[in-house]
């Protein structure tokens, strides 16, 4: 989770939770969405989803059946750790089925652009699945879409050395965008 989303945290109470988790949480069930069950928030609902650097290169079964709550994705256009292109396609698919979803891209911003402790540059030992395309099988197994075998971090598509780094302009813009979005969504204005 990014430093920016951590700063907003969660507010409890009916219908005012926000989440930076995947936008692909399943529809609410009697016990609540999976993330709500995992974190002990049963009975509460999320008001919005605000993922940063979302990994959109896995196609899940039913991944267009997401919450009716607004989804705002924030991504660096220069992110080569978790590239933005698959998110563009996913947002387009979600929009076509009537979801309230927006992708905001920041030019020249890399992965972790909101972390002021990171200088822009490669992370030589970090693994990235940026060249991998994965799909979910009916039994829940994630497979490599090219090899049709269960995905592992040993697959040839896994690479090392993506770039990371702080971008002050992107951070300031994203911070303002998230604040404004949450003020409207949570009816704080």
Tell me the role of every PLM-derived stretch:
Residues 11, 32, 95-99, 183-187:
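Sec-exported extracytoplasmic/periplasmic mature domains
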Residues 100-189:
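C-terminal catalytic histidine-bearing segment of alpha/beta-hydrolase fold enzymes
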Residues 5, 45, 73, 85-89, ...:
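Extracytoplasmic/secreted proteins, especially bacterial periplasmic and envelope-associated proteins
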